[in-house]
Amino acid sequence: MLFRSDTLGAMSVCDPQNSMHGIYGSYLSEHIFTKAPKLGFNSDCSVEIKILEENFEKNHEQIAGFIVEPIVQGAGGMRIYNPQFLQKARELCTKYDILLIADEIATGFGHTGLMFAVEHANIKPDIMTVGKGLTGGYMTMAAMITSREVSSVISNSEIGVLMHGPTFMGNPLACSVANASIDLLLESNWQSNVKNIENIFTQELQNAKDLKLVKDVRNIGAIGIIELVDDCYAQKVQDYCVKNGVWIRPFGKLIYSIVAYTIAENDLRKIVKTMIDAIKSIEK
């Protein structure tokens, strides 16, 4: 399956305030959204869980599936949150016979320290989407993985197949690259590498916490994030970083890096230091 995140259907289930909803307006179909869990892997998300429960109780007859980016919301603000939220979502989906759909496009294949982010909550989704890490970034490819129950419904339907066919679906070269990438990952010491990356991110990002232009720093696995107080500084930070040999792509007021598991320690420290130096240069 080809990774096509910017279709109308995909955009319609993204953040209604900070995504492309505003640009496309009434072209996108309406969906029910719930309050995002509080920032922090160990933060108390009881309020958001309560709201989630109320949403399910009120709207479950209208809900076919609950779509969530597990543990880390990507385009929704690079938000890291408590696995308890996912556990409650799984419980509610089971209770009301609703499909739990985990979007692991950005988090899958080790980015959060476990092979898949849902493992932090010890749950199994009914449908999981994967991409990016599927081929190690070398080829464009994504996939939808389903439970046996879901696949049986599709297989036993009148048509007998999932009627979805992007131009490059099942691309032989991309499939070969995906197989090779997964083999290399499983043969490597990736979990130890990602843990070391996480520790370095934790250490180095502390140097940004007290800067006046920084609202928050957070990290998990191979993902490190600096949230600025305003997005007006992002372009200057990017310009500084590129000029000093570090390529970054800010997202709104977020300066972040998702690094390769094979990155050298000195390169990782340089990335974080350069991002921090960029912010300091603006504060002068």
Question: What spans do the regions from the language model cover?
Answer:
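Conserved N-terminal phosphate-binding loop of PLP-dependent enzymes in the Aspartate aminotransferase
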Residues: M1-K284
